[in-house]
Amino acid sequence: TEPVGTMIVDIGGGTTEVAILSLGNIVFAHSVRVGGDKIDEAIIAYMRRTHNLLIGEASAERIKKNIGVARKPEKSTGIKIEVRGRDLVNGVPKEITITEAQVAEAISDPVRQIVDGVKMALEQAPPELAADIVEKGIVMTGGGALLRDIDGVLRDATGLPLSLIHISEPTRHDR
């Protein structure tokens, strides 16, 4: 059997795992300490830094899931969402509106780190497996892979096709 290379990118909560597999074995694996949690933290830090607004993890995750996007929309600021938190200047509750473009700016660093991890793994791929990856592309999975346009960002950065495999979390009924 001839070795066939496959690249898997699993963007989880705490880390992004990048692996190159062949014949059921891991040929190369790399872990980037960036995942959905770091994206949430970046949103929290952005809100604090640019709006003097303290928000919690649940609010950051809601922002990420509702209007999170891996890069700025081309033609406008995109969809808007209301965000509530505590004003860090006077300590009272405050509501502001933020846009997709602002969220993309907020999460640009963790997105870049994920892209860099994928590119580094591609550079380490054995040549014969790299040819397979060029042909088959990259398979993405994990909750972070659901971030809107992360596939487009990775496609543009690598020149490779991407496919998404979403494995839903088990429900109480499934257990």
How would you describe each model-predicted region?
Residues 130-154:
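Glycine-rich phosphate-binding loops at beta-strand->alpha-helix junctions
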Residues 7-8, 15-20, 54, 80-82, ...:
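Structured core elements
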Residues 150-164:
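Catalytic phosphate/nucleotide-handling subdomain of diverse soluble enzymes
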Residues 23-108, 112, 133:
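Phosphate-binding glycine-rich/basic clefts of nucleotide- and phosphate-handling proteins
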Residues 1-9:
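Conserved phosphate-binding catalytic cores of ATP/NTP-utilizing and phosphoryl-transfer enzymes
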Residues 52, 119-136:
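Phosphate/pyrophosphate-binding loops at sites that engage ATP/ADP/AMP, CoA/4′-phosphopantetheine
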Residues 8-15, 21-25, 35-37, 43, ...:
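A short acidic Gly-Thr/Ser loop motif
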Residues 165-175:
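Single conserved hydrophobic/aromatic residue that forms the stacking wall/gate
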